[in-house]
């Protein structure tokens, strides 16, 4: 093997074709997402009914605290900036970068990480079709604020974002779900105690960010966390059963 080939082998655990295939998988998922988005967007009245149901349920539980959280965050320009960037970057940029990092640095963990994200997101997308839900920012009469619309130059009406996002995708919170999956996987592969602590805190911070920007109810966040844990458990048990019968 030539020196160049040896260096490429070290950089790419399974070669260029395998890496390209991973990108194709995510492109396929994006196509599926757009199809689901189109289906969920049609039932606008249902999305608002479901959003009101979530609000009334939380109110009945005595836990409609999101407007209070929003007022606290909106009083600080630093918190508004941090939570806004977290909302925009956590689901795609952070997920994408951690996938690449695990692919190159801990390749033996990559397939499990990828599969967990894909399965959990597909289940979440089914939820968007069955239960489209308008987010808090669409209910100003309840005291919610569209933080991104008021304070950020990038908001849900911005060109590419308006095209690519689903406005009625509150339940469950895929931001929170993905953040928990990323946090668990990264906790398992990083070495320093500080890094482990930061990755454990990551899903909690993302949950706080999506609530404080008016994009999710706390029930959405809880549902996202539960979905992440359930799909992870199912995949783990499936893998163990497969190994036993191998």
Region locations from a protein language model:
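N-terminal transmembrane-helix/juxtamembrane module of multi-pass inner/ER membrane proteins
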Residues: 2-93
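Hydrophobic alpha-helical transmembrane segments
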Residues: 85-100, 175-183
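Interfacial helix-loop-helix junctions of multi-pass membrane proteins
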Residues: 135-142, 166-170, 204-231
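Membrane-interface loops
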Residues: 37, 44-56, 103-194, 242-246
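Aromatic-anchored segments of alpha-helical transmembrane domains
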Residues: 31, 35, 121-130, 201-212
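Alpha-helical transmembrane segments of integral membrane proteins
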Residues: 13, 17, 21, 25, ...
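Membrane-interface capping segments at transmembrane-helix boundaries
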Residues: 2-7, 236-246
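Hydrophobic transmembrane alpha-helices
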Residues: 183-187, 228-236
């Amino acid at each position: 093997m030539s020196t160049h080939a040896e260096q490429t082998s070290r950089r790419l655990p399974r070669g260029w074709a395998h890496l390209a295939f991973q990108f194709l998988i995510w492109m396929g998922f994006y196509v599926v997402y757009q199809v689901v988005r189109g289906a969920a967007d049609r039932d606008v009245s249902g999305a608002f009914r479901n959003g009101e149901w979530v609000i009334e349920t939380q109110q009945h539980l005595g836990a409609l605290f999101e407007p209070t959280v929003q007022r606290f965050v909106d009083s600080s320009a630093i918190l508004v900036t941090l939570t806004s960037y977290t909302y925009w970057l956590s689901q795609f940029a952070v997920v994408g970068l951690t996938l690449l990092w695990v692919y190159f640095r801990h390749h033996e963990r990559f397939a499990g990480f990828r599969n967990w994200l894909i399965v959990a997101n597909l289940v979440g997308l089914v939820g968007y079709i069955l239960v489209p839900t308008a987010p808090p920012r669409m209910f100003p009469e309840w005291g919610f604020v569209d933080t991104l619309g008021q304070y950020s130059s990038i908001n849900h009406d911005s060109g590419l974002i308006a095209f690519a996002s689903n406005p009625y995708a509150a339940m469950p919170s895929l931001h929170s779900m993905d953040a928990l999956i990323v946090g668990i996987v990264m906790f398992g592969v990083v070495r320093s105690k500080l890094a482990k602590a930061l990755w454990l805190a990551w899903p909690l911070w993302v949950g706080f960010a999506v609530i404080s920007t008016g994009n999710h109810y706390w029930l959405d966040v809880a549902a996202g966390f539960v979905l992440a844990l359930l799909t992870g458990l199912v995949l783990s048990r499936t893998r163990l059963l497969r190994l036993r019968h191998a």
